[in-house]
């Protein structure tokens, strides 16, 4: 799932 990361980019956690 692509969630908004801390840096402001979409990363799959």
Swiss-Prot record:
Signal peptide: none
GO CC annotation terms, alphabetical: extracellular region
Domain of life: Eukaryota
Cell compartments where the protein resides: Secreted
Keyword tags: Adaptive immunity, Blood coagulation, Coiled coil, Disulfide bond, Hemostasis, Immunity, Innate immunity, Pyrrolidone carboxylic acid, Secreted
Statement: the UniProt record of this protein carries the keyword DNA-binding: no
Post-translational changes noted in the entry: Conversion of fibrinogen to fibrin is triggered by thrombin, which cleaves fibrinopeptides A and B from alpha and beta chains, and thus exposes the N-terminal polymerization sites responsible for the formation of the soft clot.
Coiled-coil regions listed in the entry: none
UniProt record, GO biological process: adaptive immune response; blood coagulation; innate immune response
Modified residues (Pyrrolidone carboxylic acid): 1
Its biological purpose: Cleaved by the protease thrombin to yield monomers which, together with fibrinogen alpha (FGA) and fibrinogen gamma (FGG), polymerize to form an insoluble fibrin matrix. Fibrin has a major function in hemostasis as one of the primary components of blood clots. In addition, functions during the early stages of wound repair to stabilize the lesion and guide cell migration during re-epithelialization. Was originally thought to be essential for platelet aggregation, based on in vitro studies using anticoagulated blood.
Self-association state and partner proteins as the record states: Heterohexamer; disulfide linked. Contains 2 sets of 3 non-identical chains (alpha, beta and gamma). The 2 heterotrimers are in head to head conformation with the N-termini in a small central domain.
Domains (record comment): A long coiled coil structure formed by 3 polypeptide chains connects the central nodule to the C-terminal domains (distal nodules). The long C-terminal ends of the alpha chains fold back, contributing a fourth strand to the coiled coil structure.
Protein name (Swiss-Prot/TrEMBL): Fibrinogen beta chain
Naturally occurring in which organism (per UniProt): Hylobates lar
């Amino acid at each position: 799932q692509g969630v908004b990361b801390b840096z402001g980019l979409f990363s799959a956690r």
